[in-house]
Amino acid sequence: MSALEIPHFSRIVADSDFDGLCGAAILKKYTPEADIIFSHAAQIRNGSMDEYINHETVIVDLPFHQKCGWYLDHHQTNRPTDKQSIEFEQNGGVIDWQPTPSAARLAYERIKPYADLANFIDLMPFVDALDSGGITLQEFVEDGELMCFSRTLSQTEPEYMLDIVNMLVAGSTIDEIMTLPEVAKRLELQRENRKQLQQIVINNTSIVNRLAICHLENTGYSSNGYLVTATMGDSVDACCIIHGYSDGEINDANRPPLSASFYANSFIEHGQNRYDLSRLATRFDPNGGGHMNACGCRIQEPGLEHNLAEWIDMWQHRDTVLKVD
């Protein structure tokens, strides 16, 4: 793809995690005047973002939207169908879907011939590893600066995330950014929060046939799969984390609805790519999905107890129901 072939865009819609932030920053390096909106998968799929997406919008690290002009992603369940791709491209859209370790990596490879991305070179391997389950147990336990930094990123703090993007676009390295007082303060807070959260995970997790079920709903806490699987150790092959609020709303970043996240235990040998956990995420929620090793969904009617019982039953029969073909 030459610079002439890179689609024109004036807006970037990206996921609100480290991968999405880096993807957005890389794209903004190419088009500095583009504005950025951080979102999440459910908002794309339920139509909440429709008014912000048009042919001048590039979407990165989020589900496909037929009204955008350029689509970049790497999630298994987000890959457009052949029919969607044909219709989209006939209308002038460009699809870049590749099974890269991160969506930011895909953006990086597309943009690097045409923009100076030198300050991303040292950052990209970590973003790839974090998003693809490539963090080692030692790296996780050590909880280095980048691990902490990744947890400071949230849709609840869009101004902070945009500040980070603008510094990356201006050429700052991630090491320089992490020394800034407003970032260093957040890093220290995340270190303390993780100690508290690990105890909360211990107190609220049970194991059913090597599936860790962590109940964080209505607590105000959330966790990624790394913390739960590291805490439970080699006694689990995967985890299911319930989070959000019983009265939550998709468009309220501070009080999201009840949801479930599923993660393979990437810390054990052959822990990934054994079971397709996205089949759990899409069992009830047509808008659920992600990767086979890391995915999520919203709790659907008739409710959590019913959904969880079915997921446990599917897990009990995982060697036939979930086993990767």
Predicted regions and their residues:
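Accessory alpha-helical/coil subdomains and C-terminal extensions
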Residues: 138-196
